[in-house]
Amino acid sequence: MENAKITNLYNLDETIAKEYLSQFTYPWEALAGISDFIKELGPTLDPEIYEKRGEDIWVAKSATVFDSAYLHGPLIICEDAEIRQCAFIRGSAIVGKGSVVGNSTELKNVIIFNSVQVPHYNYVDRKSVV
């Protein structure tokens, strides 16, 4: 199980959820609380960098979100991220800095680290840390 520990799998400096994930040994331990974490963190985000776009939805002003993308909170989209056409974000999701969510990709209950590319037509759901 040593290889499955958060500290062995991930560079926590590459996520806005570093402090949150640091509380746990294994990734699956953190997944049930993603929604609550986002609801706590969102209101503390710098309004010069992030804008609130709906109930429990914070999007960095430098992020690109296509008009056809569906966003449902709780959700944080970090700086320079790109949410492409018809992406479907169902909530409890963090999209890291510089990450790309491809067209027609669905996300729910996930933490996407910085600079991750989730290609088009993917389904990242049911509690994932990518």
Which residues does each PLM region occupy?
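Structural signal for interior beta-strand "rungs" in well-ordered beta-sheet cores
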Residues: 51-130
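Terminal amphipathic alpha-helical/low-complexity segments used for targeting or macromolecular assembly
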Residues: 1-56, 61
